[in-house]
Structure formats: C-alpha cells, structure tokens
C-alpha cells in the first residue's frame, strides 16, 4: 500500500473548513483511494492522508487533484506533499468498523 498526503496551512479556519469539505465531497474515496483520514494539527492546519493500493494509483490520484491544489495555493494556502510506502499498518483485533468510520 502507498500513502499520499498533503499538509495544508490556511489563512484562517473558515478557509480550512471550506477546502476540507470540498476535498471530501470531490476527491475522497475516488480515483482509486481506499481510505482517507484527516489530522487537524491547528485551527488553520490539516493533514489529509489518502491510502492507495500502490504508488501508481496514488500518482494518478495526484493528477486528478492538481487543478484543485493549484486553486488552493492561489487562495494563499501553503501545502506540503507527503508520500511514501505504507508499512507496519496495524489495527487491534477488538476495533470495529463503526469505530473507524465514526465522525468525532
């Protein structure tokens, strides 16, 4: 498996929420993405991670999001791409699918 992520730093919280909602609606779990999650590291910052079966699928996904990423940059957000093989992916045996998919 392969992980592809972007750490976005926005100019404000409203921009963060708007872009995050847009990306969820238009790109999450599409174009070969198997799983997605977000890490909200600050009021105006989020790390969006997508999990793919392989690097080729992740790279193709990146091509689909290129225009949106450019528009996000044009609005003044700073973005850092994070990507690499996903290893040591462990899940406890007592974790349920409901726990993994619940919104907090």
Please state what every model-predicted region is.
Residues 1-49, 53-104:
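Short S/T/G/P-rich N-terminal loop/turn motif that feeds into the first structured element of a domain
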